[in-house]
Amino acid sequence: MKTASLAANHSLLWFAVAGLLAARRGSSRKAALRGVFAIAAASSTANAVLKPLLPRRRPAASELPAYQTLDDPPTSSSFPSGHAASAAAFATAVAMESPRLGLAVAPLAATVAYSRVHVGVHWASDVVSGAALGAGLALLSRRWWPVRLTDEARARPLDTVPVLRDGEGLVMVSNQRSGDPEHDPADDLEAAFPKAVVVRARPDRDLDEQLDEAVEVAGSSVRAVGAAGGDGTVAAAAAVAGRRHLPFVVVPTGTLNHFARDVGVYDLQEAVDATAAGEAVAVDLALVEVHPGATSDAVIRTRCFLNTASLGSYPDLVRLREAWQPRWGKWPAFAAALVVVLRRAEPVAVRIEGRWTKVWFLFVGNGPYHPRGMVPAWRPTLDSGLLDVRWLRADIRFSRLRAVAALLFGALGHSRVYGQREVAEFDVELSVPGMLATDGEVVEESGRYTFRVAPQPIEVYRRREENWTGRDRPFLP
C-alpha cells in the first residue's frame, strides 16, 4: 500500500500507464489522452481550489506502526484527497473510451485511493470525496470532448440491391495514390472480386470520367459501381452511382476513410460479405451547385459530396487537426488547430439567409452532425434528408477569443459568434469568389453556392452484423 501511494505522487503512476496506453493507436491512445486531461482537471481542482477553501486536519499518523506511515507526510489540507481524485479521474476517463481498459485500470485506482487511508494521511471521507470529484470531472469532459464508442451511423436497411457473387456485374475504380503509396489495392480487389471490372485510376484524368467510361464499355451487364480509396475517391465514384442510379460499393484504402467508417465498412472483407449477400443501406448524397461568375460561361456546375463541404478557413483547420490528431486525439487537436487558424485567418463576407455578414468559416455537413452546438464530429444517421450548416461569425468584437473560450468551456452553441441551421437546402453568396472544399479537397471557386440533398439516396452495400455473428470486426484507428 505504501508503495502504491508513493508511486502515485504527482500522478507519476498514471502518466506511466498513459504512456503504455498511448503506444497503441485507436481507443487505447484516446483513453490515455482523455485520462491525462482528466488528471489535470481533477488534480488542479482538488489541490489548488478545494484544499485552500476547505482546510481540514489530517489524521494522527503517529498512532500507526512506523513501517506503515510515510517518511515525509503531506502538510496540506486533508480534504479532499488529491491522489483519490486523480486515480478516479484517470480510471473513469479510460473506461469512457474503452470499458475493457477501464476494467483493468480500476483495481489499481482503487488501491491508490485506499492506500491514502492505509498510510494515515487521509480520512476515509477525504478519499470518497476525492474519488467522487475525479470521476465527476472525467464524466464532465463529455460536454466538450464527446465519446463515440462505435463508428457506423444508423441507416435504413435495403433489400433491393442485387447479389454480386465474386463481384459479377461490379465496376470498381482503385486509386493507388490514396493511403499507402507502396501498396496497390487493385490487386486485392481483383482477388476478392474475380468477376468484377477493376479500373486503375490514372492521375492525369478525372476519376469519375474514368469510371463512367468503364461503365459504358461494360454496358448492360453493370449492376453496381464502387471505389477503393480515400474520401475524395469515394465521393467521385459515388457521384457516378447517383447519376446512373446504381448501388455503390466502398472499400476503405485511404488515410482516414471518414465515409467508410460512418457507413460501417471497415475493410475489403466486409464489402465482399455485403455484396455476396445483397445487404445495403440508404445514404444521402449531398449536392452543391456552383453558380457561374460574371466572366464565365452561364452554366451551373453540380458537384457531389458525401461528408462535408466548407468555405473560408475551415479546410485549413481540418488539415491541421488531422495532422495532429494521431498524437493528441481529435478534440485537443481541434482546439489547437482552431487557435492557430483563427490567429491568421481572414474573414469572408457572405450573404446568409438574405443578410450580409462576415464569417471565419462556413461548414456544411451531409446530414446533422453531433454534437450540436460544438465541433462537428460524427453523424448519427445517414439518411436524414437534411444538411447541417454551421458558421463562425467575424463581425462581432473579439469573436476569435470568444469562440476559443466558448469551445473550451463547452458553450460554443450558446455563443453569439456561432450560427447553425439544419435545412434541406442552403444558399450562400460571397462578396469575392472563394474556394470551396468538399470531402477534404479544394475543388471549385465561385461567388455563389447552393447546397441541397439529392432527391434519392444512394444504395451502399453494408453487411448486417446480425447475419455475420461469426465474423470478427476490424477497427480503424
Where are these regions (language model features)?
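Terminal transmembrane helix and immediately flanking juxtamembrane interfaces
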Residues: 1-42, 124-167
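ATP/nucleoside-binding phosphotransfer catalytic cores, i.e., glycine-rich phosphate-binding loops
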Residues: 354-356, 381, 391-477
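Short, conserved phosphate/pyrophosphate- and ester-handling motifs at nucleotide-, phospho-/glycolipid
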Residues: 83, 126, 231, 252, ...
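Hydrophobic alpha-helical bundle signature of multipass membrane enzymes
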Residues: 1-76, 85-112
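Catalytic core of DAGKc-family lipid kinases
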Residues: 177, 183, 242-247, 253-360
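ATP/NTP phosphate-donor binding region
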Residues: 150-225, 235, 239, 477
